């Protein structure tokens, strides 16, 4: 019911306990809620070897600390405040009453971020979030941030209305600003009885946003039911499980309807609830009403004041079907969510008066957050596209016949690239359990089957292509793979598909100890989803992991897997919206080893580059931003500069041993920049170890430098490094300004001394 209570033992034990209400979700800036700000709260040490601390600023709601703020001076990186919070948690300073914290804010007054409260081991700096306004303009200085986020009512809303507990991850989630603006835009439109759509780029958390929209619409008295519509073709498994995970600790009911009878029962009930279903079940229900079935409920359901929330709104509902449902549900509002709207540039073919664009189908755009903005804000990663071609020919690209790409030799070249030339994309050198995954998408089910069979033949030693020993050193059982697609029961061509899928399932069962059959295809697909998503702890272990999944279209839309780093494409270029959707399977934020979403194409490189650029222009509102990573020449130049810089400082790894402690600190900074550029360079297919000879540099040299860096690295200097990076590195310069470096070091050490000064107890 949105009320938090605490259990208190009475002094007279015979009277038992009493539950006291302490905070109310909807009592915002009025009623029973009170707000306080406390500064410099002293927290005693929890362990003998620690020290007492003073916490900067805490916001209390009804006496409970719910938002904590750590402040630094402008000369210090805001990340230092983040690392200080992690240190305080390690020291046990956020226990007791402070365990009620929901939100951390870190700032150096000019740069501010927030993050959901969690234990130190779960706090990831990559999820620090900046605030933007409704037009996606950043508001990151402390004054602007405090006015927008930390004032009342927004601060209360942030921790009580715009937070979600993900039950599957056992984690608290705070919504990002663009999600909040979208939710509020839908609420405003619903009060005006207007429909509309939300354009949020793929990978930006549309499922969570749509969950909150569906949930919050029920707070509007005029709306009796919210129907969340998902696509029957493969999406409902992950989306529904996400909904159920969000709702497990919420105050509303989420119902998944497995059949039409359940749908009628849910919609005919008197309670307010969110119903998750497919458009096919809705149309089946309408048809049964016309046939005279469920007459007791038909009239009531037809007159419902209902809001439809449609995930992947173009795939889930066609204009024709939506028109029919609107004609039946006279009192309906429609809110579509899409990462790739259909514009006049890529509109559907005209069929009568049916909608051709997203605007025509759903109404006004209520909020937008494009791929360009998401990459700029760090909500998703950028893309890096590797245009490969297996065919060397004097013919012009457009003159190469399609049959050339059907040849077995082409397929072997593709698989050789995946198996032996994609180690960096898949993070294979990180070893067992830490590698990333990939999808190979092809044009048809027979083509997917052919790739599956050929890959099995390679692993059986029957082909000229082998998995290299270098790969096997890191992952002896690479690759673990499968194929996934929908199989119809009744289509004549599906008989062969079913036979092949039986063999696929047998292989899968043998690999993972499962027991799937064709009768449980949905269960198999769901298991593949979960194994690829790796969101449950058991999938962090190598014996439960997949490396590669072969698909046609399945998983290319609406599927979320942060560990998935690469999509390999061996098919003709897709439409702009489908390209962006497919690419966006790869650019979820995961960890520091995943810098980009990697896309590798294997045919028609010039045509692909043209189509991809057109798609990015369309979905970035006319500009690329940093959607595509730098090209090879740029990255090579950055590598050369950082290698020269580190050699100027320490010509050989052995020279690091003779550095002073202060110089070793600088070495850590320089090596991190070099390490980043070297890893980036190796992610290109153009890279070959032999090219290092030109620089009189080897992998062994790199490993020796890395050993030195690990020996002297200090985690708390990460903020210092990030501050230095913009100040001191320039790809057009050969050396670092040492005087500037010394000055910044002095500033940092002075700030560090002030931070570490222990609290003096009053006598």
What are these regions (language model features)?
Residues 588-698, 708:
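Long, hydrophobic alpha-helical segments
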Residues 234-259, 457-465:
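Conserved helix-turn-beta segment of the N-terminal RecA-like "Helicase ATP-binding" lobe
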Residues 78, 280-401, 411, 556-613:
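Signature of the SF2 helicase/ATPase Hel1-core->accessory helical subdomain module
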């Amino acid at each position: 019911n949105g009320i938090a209570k605490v259990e208190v033992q009475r002094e007279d034990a015979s009277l038992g306990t009493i539950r006291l209400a302490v905070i109310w979700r909807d009592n915002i800036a009025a009623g029973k809620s009170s707000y306080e700000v406390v500064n410099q709260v002293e927290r005693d040490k929890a362990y003998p070897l620690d020290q007492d601390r003073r916490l900067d600023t805490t916001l209390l709601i009804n006496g409970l600390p719910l938002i904590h703020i750590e402040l630094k001076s402008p000369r210090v990186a805001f990340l230092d405040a983040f690392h200080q919070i992690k240190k305080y948690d390690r020291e046990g300073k956020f226990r007791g009453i402070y365990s009620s914290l929901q939100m951390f804010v870190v700032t150096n007054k000019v740069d501010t971020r927030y993050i959901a409260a969690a234990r130190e081991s779960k706090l990831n700096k990559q999820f620090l979030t900046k605030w933007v306004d409704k037009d996606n303009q950043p508001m990151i200085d402390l004054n602007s941030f405090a006015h927008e986020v930390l004032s009342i009512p927004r601060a209360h809303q942030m921790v009580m209305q715009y937070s979600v507990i993900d039950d599957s991850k056992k984690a608290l989630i705070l919504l990002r600003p663009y999600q909040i603006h979208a939710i509020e835009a839908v609420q405003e439109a619903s009060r005006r009885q207007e429909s509309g759509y939300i354009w949020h780029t793929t990978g930006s958390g549309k499922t969570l946003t749509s969950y909150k929209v569906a949930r919050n619409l029920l707070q509007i008295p005029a709306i009796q039911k919210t129907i969340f519509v998902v696509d029957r073709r493969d999406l409902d498994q992950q989306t529904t499980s996400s909904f159920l995970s969000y709702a497990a600790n919420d105050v509303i009911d989420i119902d998944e309807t497995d059949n039409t009878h359940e749908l009628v029962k849910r919609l005919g009930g008197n309670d307010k609830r969110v119903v998750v279903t497919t458009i096919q079940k809705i149309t089946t229900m309408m048809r049964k009403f016309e046939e005279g079935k469920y007459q007791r409920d038909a009239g009531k359901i037809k007159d419902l004041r209902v809001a439809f929330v449609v995930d992947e709104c173009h795939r889930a509902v066609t204009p024709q079907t939506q028109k029919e449902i609107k004609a039946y549900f006279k009192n309906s509002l429609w809110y579509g969510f899409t990462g790739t709207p259909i514009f006049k540039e890529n509109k559907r073919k005209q069929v009568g008066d049916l909608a051709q664009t997203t605007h025509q189908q759903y109404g006004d755009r209520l909020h937008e957050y494009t791929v360009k903005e998401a990459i700029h804000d760090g909500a998703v990663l950028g893309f890096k596209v590797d245009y490969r071609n297996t065919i060397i020919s004097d013919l012009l690209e457009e003159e190469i016949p399609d049959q050339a790409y059907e040849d077995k030799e082409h397929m072997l070249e593709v698989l050789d690239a995946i198996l032996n030339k994609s180690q960096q994309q898949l993070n294979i050198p990180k070893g067992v359990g830490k590698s990333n995954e990939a999808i190979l998408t092809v044009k048809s089910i027979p083509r997917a089957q052919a790739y599956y069979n050929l890959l099995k033949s390679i692993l059986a030693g029957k082909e000229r292509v082998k998995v290299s020993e270098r790969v096997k050193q890191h992952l002896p059982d690479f690759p673990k793979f499968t194929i996934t697609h929908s199989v119809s029961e009744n289509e004549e061509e599906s008989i062969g598909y079913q036979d092949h899928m039986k063999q696929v399932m047998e292989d899968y069962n043998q690999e993972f100890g499962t027991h799937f059959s064709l009768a449980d295809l949905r269960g198999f697909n769901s298991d593949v989803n979960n194994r690829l998503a790796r969101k449950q702890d058991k999938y962090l272990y190598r014996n439960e992991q997949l490396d590669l999944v072969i698909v046609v279209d399945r998983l290319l839309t609406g599927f979320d897997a942060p560990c998935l780093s690469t999509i390999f494409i061996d098919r003709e270029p897709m439409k702009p919206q489908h390209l962006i959707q497919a690419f966006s399977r790869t650019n979820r934020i995961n960890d520091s080893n995943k810098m980009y979403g990697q896309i590798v194409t294997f045919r028609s490189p010039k045509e692909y580059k043209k189509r991809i650029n057109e798609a990015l222009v369309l979905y970035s509102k006319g500009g690329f931003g940093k959607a595509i990573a730098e090209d090879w020449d740029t990255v090579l130049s950055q590598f050369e500069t950082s290698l020269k810089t580190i050699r100027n400082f320490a010509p050989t790894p052995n020279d690091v041993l003779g550095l002073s402690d202060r110089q070793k600190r600088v070495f850590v900074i320089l090596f991190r920049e070099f390490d980043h550029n070297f890893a980036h360079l190796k992610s290109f297919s153009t890279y070959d170890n032999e090219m290092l000879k030109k620089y009189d540099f080897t992998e062994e040299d790199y490993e020796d430098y890395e050993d030195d860096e690990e020996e002297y690295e200090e985690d708390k200097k990460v903020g210092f490094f990030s501050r230095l990076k913009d100040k001191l590195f320039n790809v057009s310069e050969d050396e670092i300004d040492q005087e500037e470096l010394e000055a910044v070091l002095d500033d940092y050490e002075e700030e560090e001394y002030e931070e570490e000064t222990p609290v003096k107890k009053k006598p």
